[in-house]
Regions:
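Beta-propeller folds
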Residues: 1-176
Length: 176
């Protein structure tokens, strides 16, 4: 089984069952909601491009949901350049816009969800996260009933590690 993101939604492909594809999330929308794929801040600052993980028994999929609706757009100029050369901007620069939170401005609101593959049930983890907190990593442990969730506050001077039960949604603080 593999998972992938298309148009900000998560999908599963069951390789042993005629490569059937199933859509897991339906609320993904460009510049609004991202499921299983990080926003610019997470990709750049925390260095990852995949925000989902399978349980060790492959029965659950956990993912981070990014709500970037309150993050302002940022525009910067594009010039011809050399790598690659963008000939359409040889005479006049173009502009590229994307969600980019300046210091003190809202970041994406993040939450952790699990999807029970056989039951097709999605649950939101009951994680005590500051409204402007970060979730830099999630990973299932060898125990399929234990999802490790790492959190940081906005100032990144408080790190918490939680173990979440993906079925009950309860999160237990194990390290601060």
């Amino acid at each position: 089984m593999i998972a992938f993101v298309r148009a900000n939604n998560l999908y599963l492909v069951k390789l042993l069952f005629d490569n059937s594809e199933s859509q897991i999330t339906v609320n993904g929308k460009f510049n609004e909601i991202l499921n299983g794929i990080p926003d610019w801040v997470y990709e750049e600052e925390f260095g990852f491009s995949r925000a989902f993980d399978f349980s060790s028994d492959s029965q659950m999929l956990a993912y981070i949901r990014f709500d970037e609706r309150n993050v302002p757009m940022y525009s910067f100029p594009w010039y011809k350049g050399m790598a690659p050369s963008l000939d359409q901007y040889e005479t006049y620069p173009g502009a590229y816009e994307y969600k980019y939170p300046m210091p003190g401005i809202d970041n994406s609101k993040v939450s952790v969800h699990t999807f029970a593959i056989k039951a097709k049930v999605t649950r939101k983890m009951d994680l005590p996260l500051d409204e402007d907190g970060y979730i830099p990593r999630i990973q299932f442990t060898k125990d399929p009933n234990a999802l490790a969730i790492m959190t940081l506050n906005r100032h990144q001077n408080r790190f918490d590690l939680y173990l979440a039960n993906p079925r009950s949604t309860l999160c237990k603080l194990i390290l601060r």
